[in-house]
């Protein structure tokens, strides 16, 4: 597919790893060590067919290839866990990566990044014992260290799979008071270091094979792998969403007669296309956790939550993070908030500004999975529990689209002319109006008692699921988001008018449209319909946007969507 080749070429322009070497190597075990050990780290460019297709070398859905990324590994924490019962876990935490490891190399056979040791790790209490070695890289939030402190060997494996909370429920619901870029849950363990590289937390899926730590092994022999060398594979703890667009603007054509505009003629233009991501989880298992049914290979803390219209508002924040909706937020309603969506051509540029680099590099989120199914009844993926990309744009209809244009109200006052960039209303009959007054006045083309959607300053919204299970919008029942995967969404067209507000944000008082946690709230006009329901399944019965998604490992998934 031409798109995938172009995207991967652009992504691979930034291929590379970086190491960080600083003064001081972190905590160093007792200088009178009884032996040395070392550890070789392998980083696959993805995760691991099962019922939901996520446990394979080429995971469903829309898998197209791999992307090495540009990881900066700063710290390494190693845990030597004796096997066979209770005992002391010997650890070496926050070791400086640049001191202990060579720069990564790529294995041509497996395409894994291999991190070979250049300094041995002193061992004391683990000498003479058979251990398994667990690893955490870049514990930048200190969550792993806190979880694993003073854990007995017999309990360590279970503890390594427990939940870490990255954002509280309050932090997961941003407000305008938090500023334009509140910290997301994923942002606590994955950070972009300008345009150069990224520091992302990583953990091992499995510990090393059992290894007996022999006494009196020299540092040189441990480094060479002659004795006392463990091998562990690690993967990134977050997923990444990336969005691109075929064009920076689109023309929308009428499908029926709208005002004076005939079906098939240009109705409006779409410009200023921006995006944010939400409903990744706010917590995660420290190490990726396998599910008990094939329909959900990798479970997340919220895998069992299936919302109703009411429980979404009362319980969704127990599981999900919505702070990302406030990214690049502007308090001026006339300005479209969010990150500008780049074109595929932008990925080919050699000279990239900081702003464009931010757009090209995507956004991090925590994994979010549920039980998959072949229809609405069997799938647990619903609109209120599935990670989504929210696309915002400016919709400017032609003046001829307004059915009330040039007419006089029942009170003999003139209907004002529509001004581009101002509010407009779309009635349940599909016609455009300049005000709610026009919507209900039959004399100007309205209908008494008719409801309408208010579009504040022309802002429109579209949803895209990160990893839909089919290429057809009317049958994509599932959308698993798994760590160490990149989900690339390519907008190839925008076909219709989108939504006017976002109901997929928990509201502490659903009866009050003024939700302080929602940057795209209900405009609170009399009779404003709810665009979508959190308990609805994912498929669109009416397709607004055409999207192609590609999933990059990292595993890359990509698909196109028509909005």
Swiss-Prot record:
A lipid is attached at residue 20 (N-palmitoyl cysteine). The keyword Membrane applies. GO terms for cellular component: cell outer membrane; outer membrane; pilus shaft. A lipid is attached at residue 20 (S-diacylglycerol cysteine). The lineage of its organism: Bacteria, Pseudomonadati, Bacteroidota, Bacteroidia, Bacteroidales. This is Minor fimbrium subunit Mfa1. Disruption phenotype: Mfa1-deficient cells show increased autoaggregation. Double mutants lacking both FimA and Mfa1 lack major and minor fimbriae; they fail to adhere to host cells. The record marks 49-50 as: Cleavage. It comes from Porphyromonas gingivalis (strain ATCC 33277 / DSM 20709 / CIP 103683 / JCM 12257 / NCTC 11834 / 2561). Keywords: Cell outer membrane, Fimbrium, Lipoprotein, Membrane, Palmitate, Signal, Virulence. PROSITE patterns: PROKAR_LIPOPROTEIN. Residues 1-19 form the signal peptide. It is found in: Fimbrium; Cell outer membrane. The gene is mfa1.
